[in-house]
């Protein structure tokens, strides 16, 4: 059975690839992303050496989503009222949460903002899912486990 799937923070590397795959499998896919955390506008010139290349990659990503009929609404998922209205409008069967600060240097510079963008968005998503009895899939990274003693990390590696 095909599903209505909402990706929160879905314009990143993982999110846009996941959206394309889910759409190819026949699902109805919708993305919401603030486009303000990990995109080109959130970096200073000194943060990125190949700014034009990076901008091109992001623009190509957005064009690819559009070309494949994947709708994007620019919305900050920290805004509970606005994001709840959006969730109600799309009425997803499944919500996949990808919103986060994905760059370690940005996370370390501003842990408060990292918490706000990573967990306030998750809190709002979980609250909606609880009220509407929707499934949530939470994707994260190894950064949530802290620093590791070795360069290689496996499922058996002890967390810091």
Spans of model-derived segments:
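N-terminal Rossmann-like NAD(P)+-binding domain of SDR-like oxidoreductases, especially those catalyzing
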Residues: 1-160
């Amino acid at each position: 059975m095909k599903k209505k799937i909402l990706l929160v923070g879905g314009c990143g590397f993982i999110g846009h690839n996941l959206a394309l795959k889910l759409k190819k499998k026949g699902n109805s896919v919708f993305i919401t992303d603030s486009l303000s955390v990990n995109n080109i506008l959130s970096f200073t010139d000194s943060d990125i050496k190949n700014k034009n290349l990076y901008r091109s990659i992001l623009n190509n990503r957005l064009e690819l989503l559009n070309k494949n009929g994947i709708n994007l609404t620019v919305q900050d998922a920290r805004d509970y009222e606005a994001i709840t209205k959006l969730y109600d409008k799309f009425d997803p069967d499944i919500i996949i949460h990808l919103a986060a600060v994905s760059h370690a240097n940005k996370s370390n510079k501003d842990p408060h903002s990292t918490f706000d963008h990573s967990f306030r968005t998750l809190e709002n998503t979980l609250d909606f899912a609880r009220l509407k009895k929707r499934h949530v899939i939470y994707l994260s990274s190894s950064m949530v486990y802290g620093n590791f003693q070795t360069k290689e990390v496996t499922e058996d590696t002890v967390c810091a």
